[in-house]
Amino acid sequence: TVIPTATPVPHPLEISAMRARDYPGSDIVIEEVLNPGANYNRYYVSYLSEGLKIYALMTVPYGEKPATGWPVIIFNHGYIPPDVYVTTERYIAYVDQIARSGYIVFRSDYRGHGNSEGEALGGYSRPDYTIDILNAVASMKRYPDADPNRIGMWGHSMGGYITLRSMVITDDVKVGVIWA
């Protein structure tokens, strides 16, 4: 006699569970044109993640884009209390330096941060922020000025954790820089 056993359900934070999910991303919508940087344009943009409208800061270099598009850095900020988070503040010097070097920089607000929809429930004990970033990667792959084969990530603190998890989940991220 065969005795039925329960099939284990993977925890949503498990890498296998995260790899099994779909991250369709969406078109990137320019919500507002911001003051430009030294050699790049700055935009306040949005994309979709699990049906939520997520906002981001995006820079795009001036000039003629390379034949395959500009390389991309998805920039993952560290923990900032969601109630004081402002899209155009903090990490600006880092974003500026990367943008000046000829990269599209895409800094997501994560759900519940700034004007992004959803609840900010944390990046360590829940998969939500990583899901938002994986949808950002998928959205950047669709962006006409981006090179979908040259997407990297930069992350600080909690953003470093999100960067590492993202790189283990998808091979769409080719390189990562993690700051403690």
Descriptions of predicted regions:
Residues 1-13:
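Ser/Thr-rich, Proline-interspersed low-complexity disordered segments
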Residues 22-68:
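N-terminal cap/lid segment of alpha/beta-hydrolase-fold proteins
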Residues 68-78:
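Short beta-strand element of the alpha/beta-hydrolase
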Residues 87-107:
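Short amphipathic alpha-helix adjacent to the substrate-entry channel of hydrolases
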Residues 123-144:
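Alpha/beta-hydrolase active-site loop
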Residues 129, 157-160:
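Active-site loop->helix "elbow" adjoining a glycine-rich segment at hydrolase catalytic centers
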Residues 146-157:
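Alpha/beta-hydrolase fold nucleophile elbow
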Residues 160-171:
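Short glycine-enriched nucleophile-adjacent loop
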